């Protein structure tokens, strides 16, 4: 399932700014509205705990992937402002609910000693799938000359095929600890909540501001954006597992201090950059720091009551999106 997400989301994200500008005639105002709408399902991620009354977490994850894939598949068919808003919301519901459940299941199933390394491997698998996606996008636009619609359909369709495979090949994983089916907010988790809030702010700068900066200010094409994403994914594939191992050695505190110190430097540089090459370098460095967020998850795994994990994963995503 880790490999299924980038097939849709990387397709959607890579094409978004160019599709919005070239087909739906978006300006910065519409992009801002779209990104706000995209974050609403993330803001409501706490509600995933109520689905546990009806579905198992594994089932929720698969249904979420179906929504993610469907939203991506049909995006190119609706090249209007309202159409792009609607398909984005569908895609976003699937993406955010899947990510919430993926975090929950990972922290429940993985041993604490091996969690950083395995989470790094999960990132690496997703990065590999992203590389394949970026290569397909580059071939589709630069060599074959396809339009946005079939490329969106290929990305979403590939995710649906993986979901079908998962349903057949992995019908059931046992539940180790029964999870709470109500919202959990505990005072002793305050530092985790604070880190989650900061993580949401940095994510918005990367996804919303930096990506649009590349297209609007520096005129990056679909192919050029794909190359940037390709570089980011290659670095993750090569180093995410090693970063996970390193976090297991140096500890979560040292990793998080290094991450946020580096991000301060990158964000200040964003404010003054006027060179397309320098901006691209900052974009790559910015993305590289995402792998260090493993430390935040494993920190919570160490301090949490095991029965709190599912509910807390939803609450954390909501806090992340408040910022």
For each of these PLM feature ranges, what is it?
Residues 76-87, 271-282:
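Helix-loop junctions at membrane interfaces in 12-TM secondary transporters
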Residues 60-73, 156, 254-269:
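Structural signature of the two symmetry-related core transmembrane helices
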Residues 89, 93-124:
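Cytoplasmic helix-loop-helix junction between adjacent transmembrane helices
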Residues 16, 97-110, 291-304:
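Intracellular juxtamembrane helix-capping segments at the cytosolic ends
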Residues 44-57, 141, 239-252:
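Helix-to-loop junctions at the C-terminal end of transmembrane segments
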Residues 119-135, 319-323:
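Glycine-rich segments within core transmembrane alpha-helices of 12-TM secondary carriers
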Residues 137-141, 156-175:
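C-terminal membrane-cytosol helix-exit motif in multi-pass small-molecule transporters
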Residues 14-29, 208-225:
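Short amphipathic helix-loop junctions that connect adjacent transmembrane helices
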């Amino acid at each position: 399932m880790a490999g299924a997400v980038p097939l849709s989301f990387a397709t959607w994200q890579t094409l978004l700014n160019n599709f919005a500008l070239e087909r739906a005639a978006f300006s910065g105002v519409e992009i801002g509205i779209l990104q706000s709408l995209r974050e609403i399902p993330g803001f409501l991620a706490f509600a995933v705990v109520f689905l546990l009354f009806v579905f198992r977490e594994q089932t929720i994850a698969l249904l979420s992937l179906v929504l993610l894939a469907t939203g991506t598949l049909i995006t190119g068919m609706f090249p209007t402002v309202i159409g792009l808003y609607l398909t984005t919301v569908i895609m976003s519901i699937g993406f955010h609910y899947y990510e919430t459940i993926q975090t929950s299941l990972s922290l429940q199933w993985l041993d604490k000693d091996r969690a950083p390394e395995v989470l790094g491997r999960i990132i690496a698998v997703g990065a590999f799938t992203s590389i394949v996606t970026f290569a397909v996008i580059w071939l589709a636009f630069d060599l074959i000359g396809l339009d946005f619609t079939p490329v969106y359909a290929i990305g979403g369709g590939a995710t649906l095929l993986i979901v079908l495979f998962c349903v057949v090949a992995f019908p059931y994983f046992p539940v180790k600890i029964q999870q709470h089916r109500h919202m959990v907010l505990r005072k002793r988790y305050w530092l985790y909540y604070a880190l989650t809030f900061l993580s949401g702010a940095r994510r918005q700068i990367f996804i919303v501001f930096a990506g649009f900066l590349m297209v609007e200010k520096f005129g990056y094409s679909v192919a050029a954006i794909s190359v940037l994403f390709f570089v980011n994914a290659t670095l993750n594939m090569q180093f995410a597992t090693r970063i996970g191992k390193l976090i297991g050695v140096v500890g979560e505190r040292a990793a998080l201090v290094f991450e946020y110190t580096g991000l301060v430097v990158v964000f200040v540089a964003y404010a003054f950059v006027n060179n397309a090459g320098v901006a691209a370098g900052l974009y790559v460095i910015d993305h590289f720091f995402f792998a260090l967020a493993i430390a935040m998850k494993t920190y919570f795994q160490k301090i949490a009551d095991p029965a709190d994990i599912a509910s807390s994963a939803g609450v954390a995503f909501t806090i992340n999106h408040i910022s």
